[in-house]
UniProtKB/Swiss-Prot annotation:
One of its GO terms (molecular function) is uroporphyrinogen decarboxylase activity. GO terms for biological process: heme biosynthetic process; protoporphyrinogen IX biosynthetic process from glutamate. This is Uroporphyrinogen decarboxylase. Its EC number is 4.1.1.37. It catalyses: uroporphyrinogen III + 4 H(+) = coproporphyrinogen III + 4 CO2.
Length: 361
């Protein structure tokens, strides 16, 4: 088994020694890059773009050509699973995802397809294989999925929302139906992540974007319990290598201890949680990822550098920190500000004695 030339990201996720804090950026492949916008002109339909392995591979690689990032994340979308289940999904340019046949009854849930993941989503696995070959072991590749709760939000609401009131009301009105939907999504998500690992993903991540909308009791019942099931059933070793698992719940800081106990290796933090306090709360149970406010990337390099250093200082000495944003990068972010962020993290991250890589030993 060939070693990664840069396994800093994986070592940090496993809380092994690192020479500096690794950095990558959520949505690092995307609309803030002019080369991505040019690539999208070839296939304006977003889902068609995602389903073209060569284009998804190219989009994945683009940010690594500009910035010395410590990980790549496969270009895709969290709604690939609902799409494969037969919902009528459209990505509207100014609206976002629209599902024309929302799932709001037991009959709707029963009509959903449970496809063979490796066939229905083969385009994603082909994209991963192409990307792994193109990366040539330079950095790890992250695979990902949306959390069952977050996917269910879109499927029941029918479109994006700030509150997902329809989805939340359904929890109270038809809890059994919602649990059935979540279990179907969980079963497919486990198969989906395992197939990504089989195709070559080195790390997998679950985005629970809308978990923070729930009450503490409902969060555990309708989101975290399903995340824990995924953690228990996703492959965590491959060819003698550990496959780290990251959970990210936006606005989930109040449940940090519960998330840390759910079976993941690392917890992503949004910008509303102090990372130093978070580290004290979780101890050595998990690594932490985050958590710069994406809005600061719309300011200036000096402010960005100061904010990045503040986060690094707040986390403190030792491994177990992956620097990232607290959410996805805004499409209007200037490229020079991204470069300033990556440079600041690399220059100012607290350095430890450079270790001998233990990941592939």
């Amino acid at each position: 088994m060939l070693r990664l030339k840069n396994d800093r990201f994986i070592r940090a996720l496993l809380r092994q020694p690192v020479d500096r804090t690794p950095v990558w950026i959520m949505r690092q492949a995307g609309r803030y890059l002019p080369e991505y916008r040019q690539l999208r002109e070839k296939v304006p339909n977003f889902m068609a773009f995602c389903k073209t392995p060569e284009l998804a591979c190219e989009a994945t690689l683009q940010p690594l050509r500009r910035f010395p990032l410590d990980a790549a994340i496969i270009f895709s979308d969290i709604l690939t699973i609902p799409d494969a289940m037969g919902v009528d999904l459209h990505i509207a340019p100014t609206v976002g995802p629209v599902i024309r046949n929302p799932v709001r009854s037991a009959q709707d849930v029963n009509r959903l397809q449970m496809p063979a993941v490796e066939e229905a989503l083969s385009y994603l696995f082909d994209a991963i294989r192409l990307t792994v070959k193109a990366l040539d072991h330079r950095v790890p590749l992250i695979g990902f999925a949306g959390s069952p709760w977050t996917l269910a939000c879109y499927m029941t609401e029918g479109q994006s929302s700030k509150t997902f009131l329809t989805a939340r009301a359904m929890l109270y009105q038809q809890p059994d139906v919602f649990h059935t939907l979540l279990q179907k999504l969980t079963t497919l998500t486990i198969a989906y992540l395992n197939a990504q690992i089989k195709a070559g993903a080195d790390v997998v991540m679950l985005f629970d974007t809308w978990g923070g909308l729930l009450t503490p009791s409902l969060y555990r019942q309708f989101s975290l319990d399903y995340l824990s099931q995924i953690a228990a059933e996703v492959v965590r070793q491959k060819n003698g290598r550990k496959i780290p698992l990251i959970f990210f719940t936006k606005n989930g800081g109040q449940w940090l201890e519960s998330i840390a106990n759910s079976g993941c290796d690392a917890v992503g933090l949004d910008w509303t949680t102090d990372i130093g306090q978070a580290r004290r709360r979780v101890g050595d149970r998990v690594a932490l990822q985050g958590n710069l406010d994406p809005a600061i990337l719309l300011s200036n390099p000096e402010s960005i550098s100061t904010a990045a250093v503040d986060i690094l200082k707040s986390y403190g000495q030792g491994s177990g920190h992956v620097f990232n944003l607290g959410h996805g990068i805004d499409p209007s972010t200037p490229i020079e500000n991204v470069a300033a962020l990556v440079e600041a993290v690399q220059n100012f991250s607290i350095k430890n004695e450079k270790p001998i890589s233990s990941y592939y030993r």
